[in-house]
Amino acid sequence: MTERFDCHHCNESLYGKKYILKEENPHCVACFEELYANTCEECGTPIGCDCKDLSYKDRHWHEGCFHCSRCGSSLVDKPFAAKEEQLLCTDCYSNEYSSKCQECKKTIMPGTRKMEYKGSSWHETCFTCQRCQQPIGTKSFIPKENQNFCVPCYEKQYALQCVQCKKPITTGGVTYRDQPWHRECFVCTACKKQLSGQRFTARDEFPYCLTCFCDLYAKKCAGCTNPISGLGGTKYISFEERQWHNDCFNCKKCSLSLVGRGFLTERDDILCPDCGKDI
């Protein structure tokens, strides 16, 4: 007696017929397609065993159904793009969705390297310095009046030059007497300490920190011998070519403050009227 060889699903004999194994179980073609064949995204019918099954992201198409959703051209063996679940040939995708190069106005094709800045796009080779025309690529650049410049060209054409070192000022900087300086170049004439953000004064148009200015040029208090800066509202008394801090203008004997009072002098000393009675 001949051993039976039937379809695992419908039990029809498979002798002399085409069949397909699924998990080592034989199936007739009809049962296999009904149970296991993928459904075409386009026409909604099963993709039979005698058809090529084209897939993209777990979706399947008959070879004849795999075409552009806009123009209908076949996408078999051609590059394509997906947009909102629809497949598009590169021409249709570019016409509808690809950005245009700000410089040459041509489409920037999918997969092409591009540069983006402030909502505009360029081909990588079109994003160039306005002055030297070299591609900027990933290098730093500076925008100026709707034009882009590489840093060296911008410095040559637009940057202010520091009055001290004569080099371009690219960021920050300070202005003193209507002249531009690098922050690191604007220093005290005496000690070379940076003055940016600090209180300073000047003599003969040269800037000085307060400490150096007082040490070099300020009058000395006749009482404590420390400099009288005269800056920041500092009050002092001047008498016969001598100066005192307000706090130092006191009677030599009793230390009474003489600010706003009468006083007497005894050689280099100043005295209140009471202490000066015995003179």
UniProtKB/Swiss-Prot annotation:
A zinc finger (C4-type) spans 7-31. There is a cross-link at K78, K167, K220 (Glycyl lysine isopeptide (Lys-Gly) (interchain with G-Cter in SUMO2)). Residues 40-92, 101-153, 162-212, 221-275 form the LIM zinc-binding domain. It comes from the Eukaryota. Pfam families: LIM, LIM_FHL2-3_N. PANTHER family: FOUR AND A HALF LIM DOMAINS PROTEIN (PTHR24205), FOUR AND A HALF LIM DOMAINS PROTEIN 2 (PTHR24205:SF3). Interacts with ZNF638 and TTN/titin. Interacts with E4F1. Interacts with GRB7. Interacts with SIRT1 and FOXO1. Interacts with CEFIP and calcineurin. Interacts with FOXK1. This is Four and a half LIM domains protein 2.
